Amino acid sequence: MSLKKVLTSAGAVATALTLVFAGTTPATAAKVPSKKAKAGDECARAGLSAKGRGAEGTDLRCMTMTTGTASGQLRWWYPDLKPLKNIDWVVPANPGGYSQTSTAISESLKKEGLLSTYTSTFKPGAGGTVGLGFFQEIKAKPESVLITGLAMAGGIPSNKSPLKLEASTPIAKVMREYQALAVPATSKYKTLAQFLADWKANPKLAISGGSLGSTDHQFIGLLAKAAGIDPKAMNFVVHSGGPEVIASLLSSATVAGTSGSAEFQAQLAAGKIRVLAVSSAKRLPGYSAKTLKEQNVDLVYGNWRGVMATADLAEADRLNMVKVFDAMRGTDTWKGYLKQYNWDDEWSAGKEFGSFLKVQLPLVAGVIKDLGLGG
């Protein structure tokens, strides 16, 4: 399967966000009937049941919320849900996109009364496989979770690692994020067309991104192919996180760089970088840059991130954790983070996330092969 076909498929676009970052849901929000209910939706009368509408076919009940931003309101909820006391994150990279996501999850859970405390352990290196290996050695710690995503899915075959992501326990795929292609504000490149013309003439232009096989690498490989450049011939300069990519741009160590769009927001607002294109189907709020498609590059691409628990997690604890994360999805705090970071609400919980991984991981392995890695 071709690089373009695989990544275009992998980057299918979720419904555009129209969510409002606010402390409470507007009073005019419609009550959701039981046959359409999701955890966190408003409901009409306490005690009503929504059979099979929860994660993995579990039931929801219309309940008066006692904590969080919806306190005092009627919401579809899990009657047997137990808030988590602690989450101990393993973050398989330096601070950047992964930790941004894990922090957004943790702060959402805390504010909504679903979590008491959380900690993070950073284990960067080898496309996320250092962190994955560390995580998969953890035993008898039900509070331990791993933040993962497309970067790790690519990092495993890129580094010829024997580790298998699916050996851990899938909890939830929580979002999809789009890429931005950026240059320093002082760059001569004002448009994507100018940059692509020079890149085609000189494929060795230094372009910064994440680790080998990462989301950034996959995206730049696809962009190269669209520009008529052999992805195996490009000069992709690896870094362990978004801040390092930004530093390489600001120091002119690289000509251009890519990362998740949220990574560049602060530097863009400060006027230190210029974004030439974003990889979403529609323009992103806060970015004046056009999409790739608007600039005659037929590419829509997005990175997903998700949460894994340890392989030995007891079934009762697994199902409760799945419910906690699924409940978080419907909260105003989490919806606010989706809006703030331009993330798409692309969600799958528990066994559904496991089914996604069974399809996704072989596809990503094919992408890595097209990049000349992992052979």
Where are these regions (language model features)?
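Flexible hinge/capping segments at coil-to-helix
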Residues: 183-203, 316
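Periplasmic-binding protein-like
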Residues: 201-202, 326-343, 368-369
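C-terminal lobe and pocket-closing loops
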Residues: 263-331, 359-363, 367
